[in-house]
Design a protein with these regions (language model features):
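Short, surface-exposed ligand-recognition loops at beta-strand->loop->(often short) alpha-helix junctions
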Residues: 9-20
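Short, charged/polar surface micro-motifs in flexible loops or helix N-caps
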Residues: 12, 47-48, 57-62
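Short beta-strand micro-motifs enriched in acidic
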Residues: 42-44
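An amphipathic, aromatic/His-enriched active-site/gating alpha helix that lines ligand/cofactor pockets
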Residues: 24, 28-38, 55-90
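Short, low-order "capping/linker" segments at domain edges
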Residues: 92-99
Length: 99
């Protein structure tokens, strides 16, 4: 499995907008039901920091891509304008997990 973690800080006056766009991504994912990855997003307690985690599954023959989801494309298109601290993506190693 390949994991990617993306961290950034939204502008305080655009954090709710950012969350709304993320919620549209999840609505689109729910409607499309793509296969081959797990996607989680966290809004941290400071209200402006977000962490996205994408885990690509190895056991899917023809995995779908988050990049192909229209709502995700719309989310990514304006991310720079919504951020005080630009997104930083890093590969991550899964050490363990529970449920």
């Amino acid at each position: 499995m390949k994991a990617t973690v993306v961290r950034y800080q939204a502008k305080a006056d655009r954090a709710d907008e950012n969350q709304g766009l993320i919620e549209k991504v999840f609505a689109d994912l729910e409607a499309r039901q793509p296969d081959g990855f797990t996607y989680k997003v966290f809004r941290l307690a400071d209200g402006v920091s977000f962490v996205h985690v994408v885990i690509e599954h190895d056991d899917v023959a023809n995995p779908d891509s988050l990049q192909d989801v229209p709502a995700f494309q719309a989310f990514v298109a304006g991310i720079a304008d919504r951020c005080d601290v630009a997104p930083l993506a890093m590969g991550a190693t899964i050490v363990g997990g529970y449920r």
